[in-house]
Amino acid sequence: MSFNKVPNIPGAPALSALLKVSVIGGLGVYALTNSLYNVDGGHRAVMFNRLTGIKEKVYPEGTHFMVPWFERPIIYDVRARPYLVESTTGSHDLQMVKIGLRVLTRPMGDRLPQIYRTLGENYSERVLPSIIHETLKAVVAQYNASQLITQREAVSREIRKILTERASNFDIALDDVSITTLTFGKEFTAAIEAKQVAAQEAERAKFIVEKAEQDRRSAVIRAQGEAKSAQLIGQAIANNQAFITLRKIEAAREIAQTIAQSANKVYLSSNDLLLNLQEMNLEPKK
């Protein structure tokens, strides 16, 4: 069969040219689309090149260009994130302590290429658990169990200092370190509760003693006042019998007021109200 005898199709060259343009255009759009990548807010990127490896440049937020097939961006979140760890260890006086720690951690932005080379993308899971557990064991072992309670702030500062130094060796920054929980064994907890009860009982006994002392002093002062009052009354009676008469009149007034306010009816002599007022001697003693 001879292909020279195949008739020419009208418009075939134009169709072929259009197909070529479409293919080239599609490849161009695909290449352009795969040549751009975005770095979101709070993130940074490093570039891996198949020929040269990791580049030293750190790419900030925004849209950036890369060579498809040859380059691949690795994007890191550089915002501080909380990391929680609980560890059980022994104190200086051999008490078991369960301590919880919360750290705010982030990668150092200018050290991302080195972080990727040595630790990869899951840097926090590879570094933080080990250095946190080791630091907690080392610091807690320096304190007695009671000191961990009374000197909690100092313990937290020491843990933060050591952790910050150790994390910086792996290009990781720690913005905050705080102790969240501190739990002791049953025996130590029972001893603490018993000590608190004893302290409360001691305070209560001290209060009772102080109150008894105050009552004693009040009784002495009251007795001294009554003795002085009796002495003054005796002197007044000795000097003037009218003092007794005055006291009788005051007593009669109180009796009359009480009877007047009472619901019961009482009949008394209007002359002396049963107090022999008419027989009173108002003349001063000579």
UniProtKB/Swiss-Prot annotation:
Mostly expressed in proliferative tissues, including vasculature, shoot and root apical tissues. It is a single-pass type II membrane protein. Keywords: Coiled coil, Membrane, Mitochondrion, Mitochondrion inner membrane, Signal-anchor, Transmembrane, Transmembrane helix. GO terms for cellular component: extracellular region; mitochondrial inner membrane; mitochondrion; plant-type cell wall; plant-type vacuole. InterPro entries: Band_7, Band_7/SPFH_dom_sf, Prohibitin. Residues 1-13 are mitochondrial matrix. Residues 186-219 form a coiled coil. Its main location: mitochondrion. Residues 33-286 are mitochondrial intermembrane. It is found in: Mitochondrion inner membrane. SUPFAM superfamilies: Band 7/SPFH domain. The chain crosses the membrane at residues 14-32. Prohibitin probably acts as a holdase/unfoldase for the stabilization of newly synthesized mitochondrial proteins. Belongs to the prohibitin family. Component of a prohibitin multimeric complex in mitochondrial membranes. This is Prohibitin-2, mitochondrial. It comes from Arabidopsis thaliana. The gene is PHB2.
